[in-house]
Amino acid sequence: MNLVVVGSGYVGLVSGACLADKGHRVICVDISEERIEGLKRGKVPIYEPGLDAIIARNADTGALSFTTSLPEAMREADIFCIAVGTPPDEDGSADLRHVLAVAREIGQHMERPALIINKSTVPVGTAEKVRAAVDAELAARGVQIEYDVASNPEFLKEGMAIEDFMQPDRIIVGVDSQRARQLLDDLYEPFVKEGARLIHMGVRDAEMAKYAANAMLATRISFMNEIAGLCERLGVDVEHVRLGISTDPRIGDKFLRSGAGYGGSCLPKDVQALASMARSVGFEPMVLNAVERRNQVQKQWLFEKLVEEFGPDMKGRTIALWGLAFKPGTDDMREAPSITLVESLLKAGAQVRAYDPETKDTAPRVMPREAQENCDLVFVKDQYEAVQEADALVLVTEWPQFRSPDIRKLHKGMRGDLIVDGRNMYIPAKVRELGFRYVSVGRS
């Protein structure tokens, strides 16, 4: 099948590359000339394990190509996938300007029957808005063309997106016509043949399913962080509690690790958007409000532990950070807990030395510029360079390379002996036996 994927960000690139790898012909469109020219040269603008190789392989065969011109890409397309951003508006609701702009442009240039698929995370009712936008453009042109609008949300985990797309636990397709259902069945036939479960439902149902899934994941994280806070005060080890509940098959072990809070491009904005959606129809989202509030509080936990040690005035203190990305396996800094921590440390007068194996390009763009210029915030190229003369080491992101550190290098480099573990990577007794003071989440 011939597809156009509009939006060459995280969702668009992963979806386009993987669909091309399954035998479809895909054109990825983006308004950024710099991004498209880079992709044509083989420069992938995001870090995702395996993505570079799959893009290169399919670009070489001609199955995957890139352009800034949507009208040019549309000429032979059967399916248009909208995969543009839906950032939060001031009230937390999803901003649909980019989605509807794409819909209008499709309506302006559509020449034959097609299927429009929303892969962007959008509120319930967005498909109707997309249809209205397309209809208005077709009416302005004085033409009638049959088309369908479907919802096909993605369920990709950053750092595992290729595996998630190629070996999905489910594929949700929201359709309101038999024609749309058949086209989506054809699109995903290669996946179904390999055992993927294709779930059909209405368009509005699919739109809601995406938000509900992310809200549930965020709820599990915030719930476990709340339990961790209680464990700290009662002298209980939250890791033992986690083991005790996660082995119950009704609960399972996914998204039950306490830590410094969740971030990324999905959970924070989707919880806000779902809560906003609820309020817009007169329904008070009490659980969602609590999930978001707990996460905001949890993001301050690392800084609060440092204040307990050094006091609120940290002038003359150097704090080393291991990890900046919101999770391992990605360079994504959106809503990362490290941002909250760095801003608080700088405000308290501390100097910060930070290392992350993948955020050399993304972190400097979102961290305070003035602090970088006056060297109060320094990004280093090695985890042991980060700890030089540090009064404390804070583990922010649980990259595998931090799991078994060289203790000799830590003792030699650090001025202090405090380790604050925001991801519970280490065993408290062992760290203390090695001569460090150790603080972790929900453990005494």
Regions found by a protein language model. Name each.
Residues M1-S444:
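Structural/interface elements that position substrates and couple domains in central-metabolism enzymes
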